[in-house]
Design a protein with these regions (language model features):
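Anionic N-terminal interaction surfaces
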Residues: 1-54
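Acidic, Ser/Thr- and proline-rich intrinsically disordered linker/docking segments
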Residues: 5-11, 15, 70, 74-134
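Generic preference for well-ordered secondary structure
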Residues: 38, 43, 65-68, 103
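Short, conserved turn/kink motifs that form compact alpha/beta structural patches or helix kinks used as
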Residues: 55-67
Length: 134
């Protein structure tokens, strides 16, 4: 379960503030769509899920595999971020837009996930403590 992997992450990486972690993925790119009678075939790239940790130094992305286990870690310092925007979505996801030098990353932040009440609580905590706004 996702919450079990979150607990492992907190212990392994000695994370001080468990509530400063959320869950999301980078924007998905659709490469092609092939509509056929009775079925539609499409190819997408970029669907990698992450635990995303915010602290005073920056944002850490912990990439997850299909079992929601951490397989890699990437860090972006607040000093390296040229522009940071957070847009509230209508239904399932919000969007975080990070600009580093000339590159823009679009990250979808899940508002909730079935059987994972912590996600909604953590997102409320992050918004309330201004973590989503540089």
């Amino acid at each position: 379960m996702l919450e079990d992997e979150l607990e492992k992450l907190v212990i392994k990486y000695k994370i001080d503030d468990k509530k400063a972690i959320t869950y999301g993925h980078f924007n998905v790119k659709t490469n092609f769509v092939l509509p056929l009678p009775g079925i539609t075939i499409y190819e997408q790239t970029g669907l990698n899920f992450f635990f995303i940790y915010f602290d005073k130094n920056g944002i850490t992305f912990f990439q997850l595999n299909e079992k929601n286990q951490v397989i890699s870690k990437s860090f972006i310092s607040w000093n390296d971020i040229k522009d940071f925007k957070y847009k509230n979505g209508l239904l399932l996801e919000d969007e975080m837009i990070i600009t580093i030098n000339n590159e823009t990353l679009k990250v979808k932040i899940a508002k909730f996930k079935a059987c994972n009440e912590w996600l909604k609580d953590n997102n409320t905590y992050l918004k309330g403590n201004n973590h989503f706004y540089k």
